Amino acid sequence: MADPRHVLHEMHYVLIPGAWMGAWVWAEVAETLRREGHQAHAITLSGLDGSDDDPARVRLATHVQDVLSYLRAHAVEDVVLVGHSYSGVVVGQVAAQAPERVAHTVYVEAFLPVDGRSLLDVSGLDVEHERRLIAENGGLWPPPSREELSQQPFLDADLIQRLASRLVGPPGHTVTDAASVPRPLESLPSTFIAGKDWLSFSREQDLLKSLRRSPRWTFRSIE
């Protein structure tokens, strides 16, 4: 346990994994936060734990409800909600729908939710191509192959092996369903953490530029 003299303020972090991943991907981060004296929990979203054989049942709203249900079940308020990649779309909706429970939202190289648009709509990917892949893969969005992972410069051989053995396809509706964002993102206290080229290919550049003008948003760069 961390020396309480070194903890300025105990926070409760809830960590949401990106597409193809479960709570396991946050294990080291969660342990580091706990050593610093914080509470930290990671959630595996519906359809990503291997227990559901009907991907059509799981929608984007299901993942939003997964997080809301966790916060309510544990009576959690003033939480720091952290999302990565796909789950930025999830945590942004949770913060907009339950601002009384979310003190701060952190987007770690994450996509942002846009009301009425899906992850695929804002991602910069070929939407029709991705939809075909989902249809051909039993309704699941296929994870990147080992070859595709090996093309990522920040992944070493051990991490590539770990990811290739554990990534699973999320239900396709989670990336094709439109987001519901009842409050403007610029009104919600948030931090956006990313490398300089993150989202350079996406359709969210104008949104990011507008959010940089919000006093409630902080931007941090990964070198």
Residue ranges of predicted features:
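Residue in the alpha/beta-hydrolase core beta-strand immediately N-terminal to the catalytic nucleophile
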Residues: 44, 80, 103-106
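Short beta-strand/loop motif that positions the catalytic acidic residue
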Residues: 192-194
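Active-site loop/oxyanion-hole signature of alpha/beta-hydrolase fold enzymes
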Residues: 39, 45-79, 96-97, 120-124
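Conserved HGGG/HGGXW glycine-rich cap/lid loop of the alpha/beta-hydrolase fold
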Residues: 8-52, 72
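Gly/Ala-rich beta-loop-alpha elbow adjacent to hydrolase catalytic centers
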Residues: 82-87, 91
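Conserved loop-alpha-helix segment in the C-terminal half of the alpha/beta-hydrolase fold
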Residues: 196-223
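Flexible "cap/lid" loop of the alpha/beta hydrolase fold
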Residues: 96, 100-102, 106-143, 174-175, ...
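Active-site nucleophile elbow and catalytic-triad environment of alpha/beta-hydrolase enzymes
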Residues: 162-184
